[in-house]
Amino acid sequence: MTASLNIAPDIKISVNQTFGIESDMEVDAFSKKSEFVPEIDKDYIFDKDTTIAILSGFNFNKRVMVQGFHGTGKSTHITQIAARLNWPCVRVNLDSHISRIDLMGKDSIVMKDQKQITEFKEGILPWSIQNPVALIFDEYDAMRPDVAFLLTKVLEAEGGLTLLEKNKVIKPNNYFRLFATANTIGLGDTTGLYTGTQQINQAQLDRWNIVTTLNY
């Protein structure tokens, strides 16, 4: 991944003026756009309840899951809010092929002092946790069990990440935020619409502070 993002929220913005929602709430934001900030869709229409839930995640460091049918704009809702906050945002699609190694990192062969050596390269999860980034896990209910257990500690507000490969405990950046989207809230698919989704450990589901629903 790229170098660390040495930035922090430096302004407050009005929810009413920015999102057209009746609310006295003000939220933290960045005054300048930086790398990884999504593009703004000026025509995007925000759902009030979903928007307030997501903004609570940004403002109060709450873990927020957005559940709903396919095509309802769950991920877009998060990225369009991030775009207006100038909050760097990274999306990871947790399909069944994403493994622990993909998220945590792996050993790579690199050249140093004209010699080939093996060096551990951190993955997207350690990098995100150490930066002021909104990390979005799409298709959360399709992830593999080994990935689910990896994320349990990260779901805690102050939860660090233990990088065994480097004997290192990573402390989250104060402005790291975590979101997820799902079709079934981890209860499994009884409709036949979402083949490949999994049941999720209840202890992990309980770690999501806010679960909001966005449907047609």
Where are these regions (language model features)?
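AAA+ P-loop NTPase catalytic core and its hallmark functional loops
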Residues: 1-216
